[in-house]
Amino acid sequence: MKLTNLKLTFGFILASCFFSQAAYTQDTATTFKLTQEAIKLRQQGAIGLETFLKSHLSDLTSPPSPEVKTALEQLCQQRDCYASKLYWYTDLEKAKAAAKTSGKPILSLRLLGRLDTDLSCANSRFFRVALYPNSEISQFLRENFILHWQTVRPVPKVTIDFGDGRKLERTITGNSIHYILDNAGRPIDAIPGLYGPKAFLKQLKQTEAIATELSKSSGTKYKSLLQQYHLRQLDGIQNQWRADLSQLGIQSPPQLVENPINLTSPPSARLAGSLAVSKSVVERPIINSIQPETLDVSSNSLKIIDQATWNKLAQLYQNDARLDTNSIALIQAKKLPNTTDRKNLSKVIRNFETVMALDTVRNEYILHRQIHQWFLEENETSDVNKLNEKVYAELFLTPSSDPWLGLANNDTYNAIDNGGIVENPVSRSR
């Protein structure tokens, strides 16, 4: 009897091994086939993506199988592409060629890290959840823009090891910006940081309209139209600022002025992080642990009004930050910890929408206003790479001249050899 049971057990083990191996082989073959298909179709641009989506329509559940999801991300060059269905160029020259053929302007994202990886900078991750999957935004982008992204530099990552097998992985510091370029690659406008979905769509529609108008002109007329546009935007921001504060009972609002941040001070990850609320909520605990609060941030342009007033301003734009059903479905698919209960998930979503609304008003009234001013002055705005250098140095406070992104504070003693800094011999020799 024991021998019979042993034979049966051994038989079940062999059968399990056989079926597991067969399943593994089938999954590997499927992955290889889908990968090859994605590589081939990517060469066809957005048409290739449409072909893939049509041929795999029955596989595009929410979320799809890991194999289909990975293939789509490779084809689109965007993480969670199954939710947005957007095709991105990673070569600006190819994007410009597509723009000239289609007559569409370019939306060029600059970010820390890569858009097709999970751990890109925080704002770009929020774009992938709140903006790109939004049904209205994704359709508008698909129909009216050529999409492109480019890495500014690798995103800093932090791993907290609890010593028992548990780890907490996060990115830290950095910001992102969308540039609107004409089909020759010249900057028309820029949308700095995170905006709520409705506010972002409004920006896209405004910039697409001026891009269309500019495409019909050249020379001095082009220059005049672009300056008139930015002058109107500046006036509109100032008028809206007064109207919003008046609605809050502030009859003599402070004037929006040039960015008063002291650029001679050493770069600070704490100060840079304070510019983007959504990402600072995630990163602040880690930054506070790494970098003691010793710097004077009184010159921060955000101090033009107090935090309580910023919060009240954000409440006026709460509806502009509402997530649509596609974005909420993507959040649910990501299986966040401690959000199995529907009430907990709703709370997470409400909190996210609240900080998005705050980001929206601060980015528009402080950062975008400054960008309009630069365009009006023709201050490093004719070349997207030069403009991007200026934005990251003077608006985002993460200049390319600082390899440590404000995280290495030479004025604070931490009792670690070499301050805990480990340099790459290759980067040191540059």
Predicted regions and their residues:
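Bacterial N-terminal signal peptides
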Residues: T9-S20
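Short active-site neighborhood of thiol/selenol oxidoreductases, capturing the structured segment around
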Residues: S102-L119, L147
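Aromatic- and acidic-residue-enriched segments that line the glycan-binding/catalytic groove
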Residues: S120-R125
